[in-house]
């Protein structure tokens, strides 16, 4: 049978970021689409994973008002200051970043159909940095055929 002759491909790419401010939102959809094209995968899955515990990858609409609302909502849930409100901040000042990451999650998974990311209307992939000003990376792992 033809099914047994198919070979699953695996492709890995790292996307590096240095967000100059403490918090920042980056639309990485284009970079993920480029990685998918490089992989040659036509049918499968893409995992996009923040490789730091103070950053997130998620899917949403690329609309500036929504971005401001998200920032305000996260700041209400886990305000950056006063630093002394967090037990983690004995030697660091980023407990809020860890909590925001816990709420927003680590990764996004997107189906690949016909060599393209299979999104719903308006969906885009974002990297959200909660404790920036240093280099961090995102893992893009693509599997399929």
Walk through the language-model features, giving the residues of each.
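Mid-chain, well-packed structural core segment of small domains
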Residues: 71-120
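Short amphipathic
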Residues: 9-19
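Structural motif
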Residues: 45-47, 56, 109, 124, ...
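Active-site beta-strand/loop microenvironment that shapes enzyme catalytic pockets
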Residues: 24-70
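Short, small-residue-biased leader/transition segments that mark boundaries at the very start
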Residues: 1-4
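C-terminal binding/interaction regions
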Residues: 120-129, 133-145
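Solvent-exposed alpha-helices and their adjacent loops that cap or buttress functional pockets
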Residues: 9, 40, 101-103, 117-119, ...
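A generic structural signal for well-ordered coil/turn residues at beta-strand boundaries
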Residues: 11, 53, 104-106, 113, ...
């Amino acid at each position: 049978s033809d099914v047994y002759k198919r070979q699953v491909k695996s492709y890995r790419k790292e996307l590096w970021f240095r967000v100059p401010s403490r918090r920042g939102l980056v639309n990485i959809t284009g970079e993920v689409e480029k990685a998918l094209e490089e992989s040659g995968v036509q049918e499968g899955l893409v995992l996009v994973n923040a490789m730091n515990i103070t950053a997130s990858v998620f899917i949403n609409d690329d609309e500036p008002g929504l971005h401001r609302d998200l920032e305000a909502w996260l700041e209400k849930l886990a305000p950056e200051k006063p630093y002394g409100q967090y037990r983690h901040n004995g030697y660091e000042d980023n407990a809020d970043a860890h909590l925001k990451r816990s709420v927003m999650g680590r990764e996004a998974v997107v189906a690949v159909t016909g060599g393209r990311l299979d999104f719903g209307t308006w969906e885009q992939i974002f990297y959200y940095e909660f404790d920036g000003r240093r280099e961090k990376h995102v893992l893009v792992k693509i599997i399929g055929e």
